[in-house]
Amino acid sequence: MSAREKQISIKEIYEVNKMEQKLKVGILGATGMVGQRFIALLENHPWFEVVTVAASPRSEGKTYQEAVGERWKMTTPIPEAVKNLIVMNVNEVEKVAATVDFVFSAVDMTKEEIKAIEERYAKTETPVVSNNSAHRWTPDVPMVVPEINPEHFDVIPFQRERLGTKRGFIAVKPNCSIQSYAPVLTAWKEFEPYEVVATTYQAISGAGKTFKDWPEMEGNIIPYIGGEEEKSEQEPLRLWGKMEDGIIQKAMGPKITCQCIRVPVLDGHTAAVFVKFKKTVTKAQ
């Protein structure tokens, strides 16, 4: 049975550890920093096997190792299973889709270009799991942290109806800045938080950089990161939203105020969070 003939549902993806055969995965935007991170994280993964790497036309036809060259930014070497894969043209959607069960998307394009190409992949009946922000506010695209809002996957049948697909869909992750505090705030919902003030201290990897690329960041900070504050204030409300009439409606609160600072750290974001609750919270709780 070919990858295209397999009918793999969300439930099956969650239960893939029970499958005897790994899912065949493609990485879109594989030569960029986020694509590299996907490849490093998926090395020897028990559920997934990277079989396809796709990037811009200038990398097409090269081995992955040749295409990346000295731009490999991970601390571990390029995985042996990936370095000799031939890079495909990410714009040749049908050709790439025919080789995989689903794709992780990390393409570096404009917002509208990302929206268009991810929908093209979904319309080939290829599920798209995206690291990009382009579809985070598309009403029928689930933006999910599984520990917070797995029920948002229920919007996928409505998305499929819009796209005209049976298997293809798009799902996205939220901005990296909120993943440190949104899960904790979710756990505290019973105490009815109504106001949140957060300051995030974000590593340079969030900008796709290393200290080799960005030496001026050593011993330096940038007190404002364009676009990050809005994402940090609004995206948690979408995670806590409800599905109504086939779309995700964001929650009305709590009110979140955020300041985002770039700091001279290679990897890992930190958040200092102040929360006001309507209900009294004890130290033990």
Describe each PLM feature range:
Residues 205-285:
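Charged docking surfaces used in two-component/phosphorelay signaling
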Residues 3-4, 10-223, 255, 283-284:
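N-terminal Rossmann-like NAD(P) cofactor-binding subdomain of oxidoreductases
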